[in-house]
Each structure stands twice: as structure tokens, then as C-alpha cells.
């Protein structure tokens, strides 16, 4: 029971950290955000952090960034389908951007997420190390 409680607290902390960071990034660049972005950010942060736990081999930092950009883009696409297409809330629309998919995601933002994911990976690793007392992170660049 204690392990279940500790995992709940851990993933709640990670979810809130990712959610508020994602929302904060949106507010910095767009001037506003939407609650769906807090949910998307929390999910993304947890999934990015699970890369270290799911893959048994020592994944290079660049590879983690590629996977993270894919994860963020996929989550943003799914949230966009629900929020923008199904619920018609029109929170964002990338249809004017080149290389977009249904106006929900585009190549430019996938590349931006690739770069920003470095900070997410490092934040997750050090949050887990310093606050949650998990293993010390180490990195292989390539």
C-alpha cells in the first residue's frame, strides 16, 4: 500500500511539474494557455521520464530527445483531435503552417520540442534524483 501511495505522489509531482511547465511555455510564447495544455504537458513529462525506465539499454541523450519530440508531438496531436476537432474548442490551429497534420501538429513545433526536450529530460532526471531520491542520472551524448 505504501508503494502505491509513493508512486501516486511521485507521478502527481511529475504530472504537475510537466503540466505547469508546458502551460508556462505557452503563456511565454502565446500570452495564454488552456487547461488541456496542462494535461498534455503532465502526460508528456511522465512519458519522457519513463524512457529511462522502459528501455533497458543506456539510450543516448540525442535519441531521448528524438523520442521525446515524437512523444510530445503525438500527445499534442491526440489532445488536438479531442479538444479542437471533436469538442471544437479551437485552442490552436496550425493549418497555416507548412508540413502540418490536420492543423494539430506541424514540423516546426516538432523541431522546437526536440530542442526543448533536453531541458525536460534533465529536469525529470534531476527531480527524480534530488527530490525523489532515485538513481543519479548519467548521460551518453551520442
Locate the predicted segments by residue.
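Aromatic-rich, lipid-facing transmembrane alpha helices and their immediate juxtamembrane interface loops
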Residues: 1-142
Amino acid at each position: 500500500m505504501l508503494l502505491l501511495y509513493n508512486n501516486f505522489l511521485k507521478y502527481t509531482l511529475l504530472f504537475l511539474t510537466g503540466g505547469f511547465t508546458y502551460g508556462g511555455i505557452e503563456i511565454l510564447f502565446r500570452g495564454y494557455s488552456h487547461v488541456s495544455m496542462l494535461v498534455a504537458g503532465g502526460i508528456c513529462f511522465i512519458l519522457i521520464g519513463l524512457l529511462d525506465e522502459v528501455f533497458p539499454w543506456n539510450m543516448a541523450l540525442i535519441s531521448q530527445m528524438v523520442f521525446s519530440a515524437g512523444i510530445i508531438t503525438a500527445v499534442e496531436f491526440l489532445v488536438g483531435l479531442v479538444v479542437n476537432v471533436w469538442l471544437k474548442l479551437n485552442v490552436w490551429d496550425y493549418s497555416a503552417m507548412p508540413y502540418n497534420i490536420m492543423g494539430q501538429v506541424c514540423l516546426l513545433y516538432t523541431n522546437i520540442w526536440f530542442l526543448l526536450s533536453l531541458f525536460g529530460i534533465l529536469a525529470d532526471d534531476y527531480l527524480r534524483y534530488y527530490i525523489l531520491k532515485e538513481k543519479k542520472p548519467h548521460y551518453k551524448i551520442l
